[in-house]
A protein has these predicted regions:
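Thiamine diphosphate
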Residues: 1-167
Length: 168
């Protein structure tokens, strides 16, 4: 996240962004505090704020600890973020980076509502949002670089594996 934080247009928002609470929190320890915006557990509102920031030329990095939480923002994702360019006849090409994960299953399986991977299903309905599943640690930095530097008018969902935080 240090790489993303260097860009003056980036803002990090989500649950446990400014205060500890998820495995992702530790990855933000070097991000300046003025770039961190803690959001209450209100996923649709979070992605709505994210969309508004993107429409104002920021590059929001919106963090959802697990896919299962991102599901609650589906309206903002499918009906808004994915359609801005189409609805505006090309006037708005927003860039959003959504960070999520598939919940850790080791050392203890947390139950099925925490380990969902909906990547393939969402790939079928999203046209201006690319989903990149980070299967190997070596893919992480190049994928975030692509998300930040892309100029094709697409936003990016980066899907991490929760077990990386415990094992890598």
């Amino acid at each position: 996240m240090d790489f993303l934080a260097k860009d003056p247009r980036t803002i990090f928002l989500g649950q446990a962004v400014e205060y500890p609470g998820t495995a992702m929190t530790g990855t933000l320890k070097n991000v300046p505090k003025d770039k961190l915006y803690e959001i209450p557990v209100a996923e649709e509102m979070q992605l709505g704020i994210t969309n508004g920031l993107a429409l104002n030329n920021f590059i929001p990095v919106s963090m959802f600890p697990r896919w299962n939480f991102l599901l609650l923002a589906t309206n903002q994702l499918i009906n808004h973020l994915d359609k801005f360019e189409i609805m505006s006849q090309g006037q708005f090409k927003t860039k959003v980076i959504i960070r999520t994960s598939i919940g850790s299953q080791r050392p203890l399986h947390p139950q099925h509502q925490h380990v969902g991977d909906f990547s393939e299903a969402f790939k079928k309905v999203l046209t201006t949002v690319e989903i990149i599943t980070l299967k190997h640690a070596k893919d992480i930095l190049p994928s975030y670089e692509k998300a930040l530097k892309r100029d094709d008018g697409k936003s990016t969902i980066l899907v991490e594996y929760g077990d990386y935080y415990n094992e890598k």
